[in-house]
A protein has these predicted regions:
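Hydrophobic alpha-helix immediately C-terminal to the catalytic Tyr-X-X-X-Lys motif of short-chain
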Residues: 50, 54-58, 90, 161, ...
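NAD(P)-dependent short-chain dehydrogenase/reductase
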Residues: 56-68, 72-109, 114-127
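Short-chain dehydrogenase/reductase
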Residues: 2-6, 41-49, 80-84, 111
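Short, solvent-exposed loop/turn segments at secondary-structure junctions
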Residues: 32-33, 74, 107, 155
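Mid/C-terminal beta-alpha module of Rossmann-like enzyme folds, strongest
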Residues: 123, 127-185
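Conserved Rossmann-fold NAD(P)-dependent oxidoreductase catalytic core, especially the SDR/UDP-sugar
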Residues: 7-52, 59-62, 66-69
Length: 185
């Protein structure tokens, strides 16, 4: 992970420095970079945190605008099962009558819908990104924060996700549409 995350970031920023290019740069990081809770021993998280630190230092050294996003779990169209989305994996497996594994249905995930991420990227391109500081996994909005965030996310347990997906899968048999309250994931 370190080579892919930190190594690429280092190569990119060194190249920009070499050519005196102070264009804005954005890093797609991960909630795992918090290195707190279940992410405390994450090699992936350490590599993402190293990339963040490199980008933030680059901004201080060059004056370039730096946007570091710590994205939570993404879901929605274009997510790939068994690769980048637990929700996509569950959808795929339930739709294809494959087993799913949930060790603890009470585990809460913070989900970010892909369209909400795209909306934030458009804001960032316009110079209207949402800035913050992080305390562990908690976002603290702050106009001059070092980090950026997507303001629309959804917190839900693994059990709730699986229950809802099973309800959708059962629709042809039950002819019932699951209740989807406003603002739900």
């Amino acid at each position: 992970f370190m080579k892919g995350n930190f190594g690429f970031a280092s190569t990119l920023l060194d190249t920009l420095k070499k050519h005196h290019n102070t264009c804005p740069v954005m890093l797609s990081s991960s909630a795992q970079a918090s290195l707190t809770g279940r992410f405390g021993n994450s090699e992936y998280g350490r590599s993402k945190k190293a990339g963040e630190d490199l980008f933030l230092q680059y901004g201080k050294d060059t004056g370039a605008k730096v946007l570091v996003y710590r994205f939570p779990n993404l879901y929605g169209k274009w997510c790939r099962p068994n690769y980048n989305s637990a929700v996509a994996t569950f959808c795929n497996n339930i739709a294809n009558d494959l087993p799913i594994q949930v060790n603890d249905p009470r585990v809460e995930l913070e989900l970010l819908y892909i369209d909400d991420l795209v909306d934030e990227m458009i804001h960032a391109l316009k110079g209207e990104e949402h800035r913050c500081e992080f305390e562990g996994l908690d976002v603290h909005p702050l106009v001059d924060g070092r980090y950026c965030y997507c303001p629309v996310t959804h917190k839900v347990t693994l059990g709730e996700i699986v229950d809802l997906l099973h309800q959708f899968a059962g629709m042809p048999k039950t002819l019932m549409i699951p209740e989807i309250p406003a603002g739900s994931f």
